[in-house]
Amino acid sequence: MELDDILDAGRGDRLFLLGNEAAVRAAIESGVGVASTYPGTPSSEIGNVLSKIAKRAGIYFEFSINEKVALEVAAAAAASGVRSFTFMKHVGLNVASDSFMSVAYTGVRAGMVVLSADDPSMFSSQNEQDNRHYARLAWVPLLEPSNPQEILEYMNHAFELSEEYRIPVLLRTTTRVSHMRGVVEAGERRAEPVKGFFRKNPEQFVPVPATARVMRRELVEKMKKLKRVADTSELNRVLNEDSESDLGIIASGGAFNYVYDALQTLGLDVPVLKLGFTYPFPAGLVAEFLSGLEGVLVVEEVDSVMEKEVLAVATSEGLDVGVHGKLDGTLPEIYEYSEDIVRRAISGLTGIKSHEKGIEAPELPERPPALCPGCPHRAMYYSVRRAASELGIEGEDLIFPTDIGCYTLGIEPPYSAADYLLSMGSSVGTACGFSAATSQRIVSFIGDSTFFHAGIPPLINAVHNRQRFVLVILDNRTTAMTGGQPHPGLPVDGMGEEAPAISIEDITRACGVEFVETVNPMNIRRSSETIRRALQHESVAVVISRYPCMLSEGAVRGRPVRVDEEKCDLCLECLNELACPAIVEEDGRVFIDPLYCRGCTICLQICPAGAIKPEGKR
């Protein structure tokens, strides 16, 4: 499907969309004037699509420097009377949470929707946090769609809700909902202003203690009203309500899809309460659903959020109903669910056995993720190891704090260059801690986009507190891991327009770093020599490793190389030190697959026997 179809579709047109693409269509239909994000899987496709069509749609869109800024951009737009949409992966809401908590107090003048894409089973994340807790923490309404059509409908509804109650609305998706495809029926596009006007009202928008106390009281009153709305919301509905089964099921979000499929497989007619408006929790509706049931299965991903609410409702209403789910072991406490998992839980409660077998897949050899052929990070890892070894710094004497990005794959051998990781930017902050607490040497790795996102404040901290470590900024000219989005270091913005590029060299020097050098990582000799001097520097040293990602438009592809079998003595240094997917050992010989080789020449530079040569040379 062409991306323009998402923009140009008329009312009633049917589109086959990813969940994330449906979110873009919803933004267009709802009249969003400002959209913002920092890219992060599983939400990345929303920004990727918006960046291509926002200009035509009349939407201002930006890839912000981080999620906190993205949320603040959206909040200011909503305060100015312009509908806004900000979206991020689940851990991104941690970064934005300071301002997120406050915008719940100040409220909005136009609709504001915050989409959190959670990642059950941590397919591309460092934790499995359940961001439904944020709705409760911030006191904002929470909607949970189950498929692309619902993403469209729920987002449209969320903007109406946001404006009626002057409050931001949190929309929670999960990896499967974000990345599933489905037929979406387009609706009307709403005309909304793309330029607003901010009318000053410090009593509403400046939460100093005196005004914040008033805002807090108003927020409590809003939530009381929203609780009544949740109880009667059309987003909450009962399926199979005429069923005579004494077991019921309550489900939300992507978990509902597993329930639906499992019941189809089992051929069971069981009442199901599908919750789409899940906070404030619709306690009245749930109490009504529970009455007359002997047991209820609560199916949700990730934490037992609804299950605890259901238990509270059953207790407060004096209902003698068994509540099953994560807490009693009927369902797993962690990771994403599947139809098999939910079907087994239902079978266990009903005694009805399924004759369906789970999908039987052949056992495959493990294939850990790897850096791409020609990746400049591989070259820099080699140079760092080599330089440290030449100075006698090895093993436990050398700590490698790392960060979020492709280079996290440095954890894999032979690089083994990832010893500590917490979050975006933590490579720099934790280097400060290791420098203060140990006498070990430290080399931290951070990417270019991550440096802009969260690496600058801890670098200032390091200089001010006289810490000593080497910071390697891996500048591959893109936000690579999430799909190649731009960042402030590039001369282009989120809508493809020319923009000022911010120099990493200038920033690091402005932070007070005296040792700042830029290298081409594909030059092993020069890179190793620079790292060697950086390790000998008595304070913070920054080495910027600059070379374009091999998957980017600016990728450099050289002439493929080959192994001269007459010279190769099978020392296997190329294999053991680089782990490049293009280098293969087979039948007692080493060869380089020309389909994979990008001509980076790193293997050529490190071969002790000089047995690797460019194609065509003898």
UniProtKB/Swiss-Prot annotation:
One of its GO terms (biological process) is organic acid metabolic process. Its EC number is 1.2.7.8. Residues 559-590, 588-617 form the 4Fe-4S ferredoxin-type domain. It is an enzyme of class 1 (oxidoreductase). [4Fe-4S] cluster 2 binds at C580, C597, C600, C603. Optimum pH is 10.0. Optimum temperature is 80 degrees Celsius. Keywords: 4Fe-4S, Electron transport, Iron, Iron-sulfur, Metal-binding, Oxidoreductase, Repeat, Transport. It catalyses: indole-3-pyruvate + 2 oxidized [2Fe-2S]-[ferredoxin] + CoA = (indol-3-yl)acetyl-CoA + 2 reduced [2Fe-2S]-[ferredoxin] + CO2 + H(+). Gene3D superfamilies: 3.30.70.20, 3.40.50.920, 3.40.50.970. [4Fe-4S] cluster 1 binds at C568, C571, C574, C607. Its cofactor is [4Fe-4S] cluster. GO terms for molecular function: 4 iron, 4 sulfur cluster binding; indolepyruvate ferredoxin oxidoreductase activity; metal ion binding; thiamine pyrophosphate binding. Binds 2 [4Fe-4S] clusters. In this family the first cluster has a non-standard and varying [4Fe-4S] binding motif CX(2)CX(2)CX(4-5)CP. InterPro entries: 4Fe4S_Fe-S-bd (IPR017896), 4Fe4S_Fe_S_CS (IPR017900), HACL1-like (IPR045025), IorA (IPR017721), Pyrv_Fd/Flavodoxin_OxRdtase_N (IPR002880), THDP-binding (IPR029061), TPP_enzyme_TPP-bd (IPR011766), Transketo_C/PFOR_II (IPR009014). Catalyzes the ferredoxin-dependent oxidative decarboxylation of arylpyruvates. Heterodimer of the IorA and IorB subunits. NCBIfam families: IOR_alpha. This is Indolepyruvate oxidoreductase subunit IorA. It comes from Methanothermobacter marburgensis (strain ATCC BAA-927 / DSM 2133 / JCM 14651 / NBRC 100331 / OCM 82 / Marburg) (Methanobacterium thermoautotrophicum). The lineage of its organism: Archaea, Methanobacteriati, Methanobacteriota, Methanomada group, Methanobacteria.
